[in-house]
Regions:
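Juxtacatalytic substrate-recognition/specificity segment
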Residues: 50, 90, 131, 158, ...
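A surface-exposed beta-strand-loop module
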Residues: 66-125, 182-185
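N-terminal, polar/Ser/Thr-rich
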Residues: 14, 20-47, 70, 128-130, ...
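Amphipathic alpha-helical substructures
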Residues: 377-458
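Beta-strand-rich binding/interaction modules
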Residues: 59, 69-75, 169, 434, ...
Length: 458
């Protein structure tokens, strides 16, 4: 299970002038993107209207090859759209805005790729195109199904229209929802994300939705929802159990780190063997959600990503710290609560996995971006989590937990790196930790232990 890493999206951002992934997005006025989407999963027809304010008079953007731009305008005046060529599955476009005009309307659409049911767990970790089918549609943030506003982070509002029997979800706050009473009606929903976002995922499916409201100490509420297939929703007690456990995890991590940063959290069933954590939701395969151990492990991992990865953003250029920290505070912490032996067995598993990584696949933790194969998981999850085990042992539980609370308070909705984590732990412990972090972050290998002398007495 992991947060969504978007290599295609990031490759586009790196090509945009003036974009700095490591800057703190909350400190600047962010561009806003408004999308109106119509999708028919049966025919896979997709049409969209985008409203945005480009940062420059000439707006360059890319869309997936299945999508064509049909119109562009400013204040009702039509503009020419120039096709700039292709780059793999991407088509590049350019629009020149009139002087003094900024709010651009783009209309585009096409027929999306059919949902590929042959994808296995490794396949869904690769870059995916926007896909649709009646059993489920997935438009990933890195799938180029909307024009990137020209900045690493932005805010958005998305309105979705679907045929009756289908429902949609987008990470963020559900503003409104209309569920048609008649078979020929249209489902409509609007979502917004006011925090800095680096992409937009859209999911749709024939879901049954259950909702529960929990109150915070501040008086505000959090909405918990399950978006389950009819079969999954009909499983006795399953949806309620997911809602119960989600509440438990939210309360646990709010106490350990700080208040939950969003207004809702949803567990969404998909037709593919996915396990993605996104802001305000987790998107898991329907078959995965049936497994009895998921609520006791993976669910908590995904909930915690709303603090680490989706609450404090990862500076991917300097290494993904969030998977190791989340594995330590979720998966490993659950084993510690089970027993000392269970925790020991997990640590041994990490060591075995690391020892099995071929020498050619070894890389420092500063080079880890996302889990694309087993070797990457052994490093970015196991070795990274072990770093936090050793760090807690070195500075003590009290200083360790104080550092995490400070790190959260300081970097909420900002991009943070390993160096920022190091500073938080140094401040909380009152001791230099450069040597510790250097040896575990910068080196690809592990300590070589040898016996130089041995003796025995009778």
């Amino acid at each position: 299970m992991s947060i969504k890493f978007r290599p295609l999206l990031l490759s586009l951002i790196f090509l945009l002038p003036g974009v700095l992934l490591a800057q703190a997005p909350a400190q600047a006025v962010l561009p806003a993107l408004e999308l109106e989407i119509e999708l028919d999963p049966d025919t896979r027809r997709f049409s969209a209207q985008a409203l945005l304010t480009p940062a420059a008079p000439t707006f360059n953007f890319a869309l997936h090859e299945t999508l064509d731009v049909t119109a562009a305008s400013v204040n009702g005046k039509s503009l020419g759209v120039i096709a700039m060529g292709r780059d793999g599955a991407l088509r590049h476009w350019r629009v020149a805005l009139p002087a003094g005009q900024s709010l651009l309307k783009l209309q585009y659409g096409g027929t999306l790729a059919v949902l590929d049911r042959s994808l296995d767990q490794r396949g869904v970790l690769r870059s995916l195109p926007p896909m649709a089918s009646e059993e489920g549609s997935f438009l990933p943030a890195g799938g180029a199904w909307y024009p990137q506003p020209g900045a690493a982070h932005f805010t958005y509002q998305v309105s979705v229209s679907l045929p009756a029997g289908q429902r949609a979800i987008v990470p963020g706050h559900l503003l409104s929802e209309q569920v048609p009473a008649e078979p020929g009606g249209r489902y409509r929903a609007s979502f917004e994300f006011r925090q800095p976002a680096d992409g937009i995922d859209l999911m749709a499916g024939p879901w049954k939705v259950r909702e529960r409201t929990i109150a915070r100490a501040s008086g505000a509420v959090v909405k918990l929802r399950t978006y389950f297939t009819p079969e999954l929703d009909a499983t006795p007690g399953l949806a309620d159990a997911y809602l119960d456990d989600t509440r438990r995890y939210l309360e646990l991590y709010a106490e350990q780190i700080g208040a939950y940063p969003f207004t809702e959290f949803s567990i969404v069933a998909g037709p593919l063997p996915t396990g993605f954590g996104m802001p305000t939701l987790t998107y898991m395969g329907a078959e995965v959600l049936k497994l009895p151990f998921i609520r006791a492990s993976s669910l908590g991992h995904e909930v915690l990503h709303n603090w680490w990865g989706n609450g404090v953003y990862v500076d991917y250029a300097r290494g993904n710290w969030s998977e190791g920290l989340t594995t330590f505070m979720a998966d490993y912490a659950y084993k510690e609560r089970e027993s000392m032996e269970a925790a020991r067995q997990m640590r041994l598993g990490w060591l075995r996995d690391f020892a099995a990584v071929p020498q050619s696949r070894l890389e420092p933790l500063t080079a880890f971006r996302s889990r694309t194969h087993g070797a990457a998981a052994a490093l970015g999850y196991g070795k990274s989590a072990m770093l936090f085990v050793m760090l807690r042992d070195a500075i003590g539980v009290e200083a360790f937990e104080r550092a995490l609370r400070h790190f959260w308070t300081r970097h909420q909705f900002e991009v943070a790196s390993w160096a920022d984590l190091q500073r938080a732990f140094e401040q909380a412990s009152g001791r230099p930790l450069q040597r510790f972090f250097d040896q575990w972050l910068s080196r690809a290998d592990a300590p070589a232990i040898s016996v130089t002398r041995a003796s025995a007495t009778k």
